Amino acid sequence: MTSRIERRTQAAIAVLGAGFALAGAAVAASADQERKPRPVRASVVGSAEFVLPYHQDKDVRSFTFDAQAAPYSRPLPGIPGGLPTDARGTVKVSHYSAERDITYTSKGRVDCLVTGVRTATLTAVITEVSPGGPPIVGKRVGFSVHDGGDSKGEGEGGGKGRSKDRVGFSWNGVNLLPKGTTPPEEAPVGTCMAPAPYAPVTEGGYVVAHAELPSPPPSPKGSTEPAGPAPK
């Protein structure tokens, strides 16, 4: 009888031990998931319509982004190794004019991207404009994005889709150079320069994947020049 009781006790201890081992593994797996590294490369993707808070009309405006960081990939004079903010990808701007009943579009090539937690600025050089659009081919324009999260989950509240997202852009009076008594001119846009995301998204949304700006890669063997820009 004693032997049978001992065997049952040992079996119960073994089962409990296995349970604790499984629980420990689950906790460890959960901790590993929480410690997952951030994306190696930053990105901004998505398409959304938005409204201008300072101008109400029936026009339909939208931006589409497919931008990825490509650090140290765009050599510049004096900076042969490029910059940590270098990027690639595309942007598309669409503007339906209710007054003219026509949609104007333009496309651009991304050249710079910087991200923070749920926020980003990027710039692109316009490569294509639809007939009747402004003569801006070759011009750099800037955009900013606030990723408000999924409004059904971790976002800031209700609304349709990702309607807590916001965008900003570098034209329509937010990037001017006042010159005394003469009318101000629109200022040139530098890489990664854009105003804060001031325009609320009404449909669609964006996803910002944040990654820290990386250090320059090692200099090529035998080279005395740094691979990236020298800190000042």
Regions found by a protein language model. Name each.
Residues 45-49, 64, 221, 225:
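Serine/proline-rich low-complexity intrinsically disordered segments, especially terminal tails, linkers
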Residues 151-232:
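Extracellularly exposed regions in secreted/surface proteins, prominently low-complexity, repeat-rich
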Residues 114-177:
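Acidic, glycine-rich flexible loop segments
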Residues 22-47, 53-55:
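C-terminal region of N-terminal signal peptides and the immediate post-cleavage residues
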Residues 49-54, 96-97, 147-149:
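Short, flexible beta-strand-to-coil junctions
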Residues 1-32:
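Secretory targeting and sorting signals
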Residues 59-142:
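Predominantly extracellular/secreted and cell-surface proteins with exposed
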